[in-house]
Amino acid sequence: MSPKTETKASVGFKAGVKDYRLTYYTPEYQTKDTDILAAFRVTPQPGVPAEEAGAAVAAESSTGTWTTVWTDGLTSLDRYKGRCYDIEPVPGEENQFIAYVAYPLDLFEEGSVTNLFTSIVGNVFGFKALRALRLEDLRIPPAYSKTFQGPPHGIQVERDKLNKYGRPLLGCTIKPKLGLSAKNYGRAVYECLRGGLDFTKDDENVNSQPFMRWRDRFVFCAEAINKAQAETGEIKGHYLNATAGTCEEMMKRAVFARELGVPIVMHDYLTGGFTANTSLAHYCRDNGLLLHIHRAMHAVIDRQRNHGMHFRVLAKALRMSGGDHIHAGTVVGKLEGERDVTLGFVDLLRDDFIEKDRSRGIYFTQDWVSMPGVLPVASGGIHVWHMPALTEIFGDDSVLQFGGGTLGHPWGNAPGAVANRVALEACVQARNEGRDLAREGNEVIREACKWSPELAAACEIWKEIKFEFDVIDRL
């Protein structure tokens, strides 16, 4: 290239490392109804101003790179760039800020959680100028959420399919989670369903191992469901885990479940991936299957306060990708979950319209328009003494799932199921009569023990069991 050509080409272009603030920090910006909004908890490296850190997040998660490039002149950055439009300090934390970023809708492929996350929680989380970065919340505008199918069926359709109303649904995870033969596994399913549960469940890591291949498990569980339904007159189900090593194998398992006539299948949506999950959700809607979602691996992503992504974001992503149930913690059991935080994302799963409420960790008003809701599943270290609190916290539109709290009953699996069903019915009746379960819950359970020896035995065996540890992720 001649010196003359170099001079001409260099007009209007200045090479070098960018100061992100000049382009991506725009406090005067008025957000649009079609923007996707994000709230990031930003911990900059020492010496990095808050405005520069927030602008860097906006740049690196949208159109930016570390230097000026020639091809910037071939597009409209003002149209496509992310904008850090507000920054606020985090109370009680030194050198930590909430950076609010607005993204134009055109940056994202329609109906793709995979593409949404690849941008917003992609390479920016490894950016050296940031000591830590956490995505606290997203606002998904109707213009984007309407490009998703969402849950295969939703809460009301599920209740109609099951013909069960006015109470939480009851479930049980079969234990031990690994090692049972398919026939013994099916036996446990039958005993729990016959005893009064609505659902039983494969644990998240039950796929197709040498001790129990998936096809054998599916057949024996279908037999157990049919037998329990015939004996009880109630519609029953077992979450058959279709998660597999390939999408093709996953779909093959879902097809076989449909051919067996079972009502519900299951997927581990984080380890399986959003693309696989969305494909399975579409199949479930087209073929009348409910879809239960397990969140295995979520704590790797969401448990640290300063880095990663809050579960409320993963919950919103699941509602868009598709699932009729998702595990949501218990507040009172063995797994992490503060009450206000948990109730915040439970509302984001179930309700159509959720107002901004920082006291519950909700940074943006969320309008789901007509997208069906998802039933939250309370599971993990719970037993009959927790039933009043669970009924009061989660309400009717939930699934209360007792694994060890059913199968650990001293008299066996069916009596364990009976104990849980009696405890639930007693709590629902007491609530409907106007009693305060938060105050009178233990008394309600003790009264019910008079009429149920199975419940009395369960109350005795688990009266001292508690999981009293401080919650890590507080507001």
Swiss-Prot record:
<keyword id="KW-0503">Monooxygenase</keyword>
<dbReference type="Pfam" id="PF00016">
    <property type="entry name" value="RuBisCO_large"/>
</dbReference>
<feature type="binding site">
    <location>
        <position position="204"/>
    </location>
    <ligand>
        <name>Mg(2+)</name>
    </ligand>
</feature>
<feature type="binding site">
    <location>
        <position position="177"/>
    </location>
    <ligand>
        <name>substrate</name>
    </ligand>
</feature>
<feature type="binding site">
    <location>
        <position position="379"/>
    </location>
    <ligand>
        <name>substrate</name>
    </ligand>
</feature>
<feature type="modified residue" description="N-acetylproline">
    <location>
        <position position="3"/>
    </location>
</feature>
<dbReference type="InterPro" id="IPR036422">
    <property type="entry name" value="RuBisCO_lsu_N_sf"/>
</dbReference>
<keyword id="KW-0488">Methylation</keyword>
<dbReference type="InterPro" id="IPR000685">
    <property type="entry name" value="RuBisCO_lsu_C"/>
</dbReference>
<dbReference type="InterPro" id="IPR033966">
    <property type="entry name" value="RuBisCO"/>
</dbReference>
<dbReference type="GO" id="GO:0009507">
    <property type="term" value="C:chloroplast"/>
</dbReference>
<dbReference type="InterPro" id="IPR020878">
    <property type="entry name" value="RuBisCo_large_chain_AS"/>
</dbReference>
<keyword id="KW-0113">Calvin cycle</keyword>
<dbReference type="GO" id="GO:0016984">
    <property type="term" value="F:ribulose-bisphosphate carboxylase activity"/>
</dbReference>
<feature type="site" description="Transition state stabilizer">
    <location>
        <position position="334"/>
    </location>
</feature>
<dbReference type="GO" id="GO:0019253">
    <property type="term" value="P:reductive pentose-phosphate cycle"/>
</dbReference>
<feature type="propeptide">
    <location>
        <begin position="1"/>
        <end position="2"/>
    </location>
</feature>
<feature type="active site" description="Proton acceptor">
    <location>
        <position position="175"/>
    </location>
</feature>
<dbReference type="GO" id="GO:0009853">
    <property type="term" value="P:photorespiration"/>
</dbReference>
<keyword id="KW-0601">Photorespiration</keyword>
<dbReference type="InterPro" id="IPR017443">
    <property type="entry name" value="RuBisCO_lsu_fd_N"/>
</dbReference>
<keyword id="KW-0560">Oxidoreductase</keyword>
<feature type="binding site">
    <location>
        <position position="173"/>
    </location>
    <ligand>
        <name>substrate</name>
    </ligand>
</feature>
<feature type="binding site" description="in homodimeric partner">
    <location>
        <position position="123"/>
    </location>
    <ligand>
        <name>substrate</name>
    </ligand>
</feature>
<feature type="binding site">
    <location>
        <position position="327"/>
    </location>
    <ligand>
        <name>substrate</name>
    </ligand>
</feature>
<keyword id="KW-0456">Lyase</keyword>
<dbReference type="InterPro" id="IPR020888">
    <property type="entry name" value="RuBisCO_lsuI"/>
</dbReference>
<dbReference type="GO" id="GO:0000287">
    <property type="term" value="F:magnesium ion binding"/>
</dbReference>
<keyword id="KW-0120">Carbon dioxide fixation</keyword>
<keyword id="KW-0934">Plastid</keyword>
<dbReference type="Pfam" id="PF02788">
    <property type="entry name" value="RuBisCO_large_N"/>
</dbReference>
<dbReference type="GO" id="GO:0004497">
    <property type="term" value="F:monooxygenase activity"/>
</dbReference>
<keyword id="KW-0479">Metal-binding</keyword>
<comment type="similarity">
    <text>Belongs to the RuBisCO large chain family. Type I subfamily.</text>
</comment>
<feature type="modified residue" description="N6-carboxylysine">
    <location>
        <position position="201"/>
    </location>
</feature>
<feature type="active site" description="Proton acceptor">
    <location>
        <position position="294"/>
    </location>
</feature>
<keyword id="KW-0007">Acetylation</keyword>
<feature type="binding site">
    <location>
        <position position="295"/>
    </location>
    <ligand>
        <name>substrate</name>
    </ligand>
</feature>
<keyword id="KW-0150">Chloroplast</keyword>
<protein>
    <recommendedName>
        <fullName>Ribulose bisphosphate carboxylase large chain</fullName>
        <ecNumber>4.1.1.39</ecNumber>
    </recommendedName>
</protein>
<comment type="subunit">
    <text>Heterohexadecamer of 8 large chains and 8 small chains; disulfide-linked. The disulfide link is formed within the large subunit homodimers.</text>
</comment>
<dbReference type="InterPro" id="IPR036376">
    <property type="entry name" value="RuBisCO_lsu_C_sf"/>
</dbReference>
